[in-house]
Amino acid sequence: MEFHHLVALAVALIVSFFATPIVRKLAIKVGAVSIPKDSRRVHKRPMPLLGGLAIIAGFLLAVIYTFATRDFNDFIKFIAEPKTIGIIFGSLIIIGLGVYDDIKPLRARIKFPIQLIAAIIVVATGTKITTLSKPFLDTVAMHPSMMYFLGDVLAFAISVFWIVGLTNAINLIDGLDGLAAGVSGIAAISLFIVSVIRGQDDIAIVAATLIGAIAGFLPYNFNPAKIFMGDTGATFLGFILAILSVEGTMKSVTVLSMAIPILVLGLPIFDTMFAIIRRLLHGKPIAQADRGHLHHRLLDMGLSHRMAVAILYVVSAALGLVSIALVDKGLLPSIILIIIIVVFGLGGARNLKEITITPEDENCKCQRTDEEEKDIENENQHEGIQNGEHEGIQNGELNNAQLEAAIGDKENQEKLNEEN
């Protein structure tokens, strides 16, 4: 890691860290709050959304500062390029959609076409796969001109599909405190290392900036969370990670180039694939939320909130490690590493099955740590939320004063912790 990478990371981290409390207050003021209305939602009390705005602020300011101070003239030229303009416009669409959705939830059939437009803008202006190679086209006998045309069409379609798919994949795993942000951060670390190995300095700077922006937000998002990043953050992270992977590893679609980003982002990708298959098999709309995601299943096994997140961090990091080995060491060492990880993973799963406890009571106290019990007791005591003093919690109808009382500020929470 070079000095300018550290600068990019540090600036993003500082801005994101100090912006998050401000965004939290803003979310409460505008009513961007997640209300725990069903069993699918793991949190027990109303939680401010819009945390993604702090991540975005740290990311954008750090990117501008790092590139502008490195060479201002090149930075101006870079901003004026069609590709950059397309990324900016596409990102603004995703951010605007996310903010609106956090304040006034939208249906998937409304969000998807808008996300599709954002992805098409990005791809049409140059952020796309440029070459399709073996075994994708060479096995088909056709005229060279038709091959080039089909290659361009497929490359465009694959690029759009990848960006839209990953934008939603990160959002779908955003079900536990710190999960989506942490997994995105691990993916950004993997992409950073891959880009450094390949000598792609611009990609490395952007990845380092994303790492810093996420790191600044995570202290507020770890369990017990004080704020969620919401659709604003989850869709933005997925969108940017998709663009980074296209620019960094997917310019030419070979088996190797496709394997790297799929491994780096394997957890959200495979969780999304299984969610789609699961819903289709049960005859449900693929956009209908359920409690069948991997993180839900870990909780249902009896794991604590933090343990479930930690396990998924390890899985994501292991996949990222394989992608790095694939770039740096080649195919054979990567296969050996995969075998080692699978063996340890199976052993860990066996031990996990033995130590997890099936909850015997409805409160599931047997699976919580003392610290988690204290957090839950604090939540139950605070403003009488669990006793129904705020009647609007179940139907989501709360005014700003009620939201502020239900959520509580940091100082009141600390006082409760001291009393306990």
Region roles according to the model:
Residues 216, 242, 264-267, 274, ...:
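Generic hydrophobic alpha-helical scaffold/packing signal
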Residues 300-318, 324-327:
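Alpha-helical transmembrane segments of integral membrane proteins
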Residues 1-270:
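"…together with the soluble PPM/PP2C metallo-phosphatase catalytic core" -> "…together
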Residues 22-25, 348-362:
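Membrane-interface capping segments at transmembrane-helix boundaries
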Residues 305, 357-420:
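Long, low-complexity, intrinsically disordered cytosolic termini of multi-pass membrane proteins
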Residues 340-344:
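Alpha-helical membrane-embedded segments
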Residues 323-337:
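Extracellular/periplasmic helix-loop-helix junctions in multi-pass membrane proteins
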Residues 22-47, 274-306:
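Cytosolic, membrane-interface loops and tails of multi-pass inner-membrane proteins
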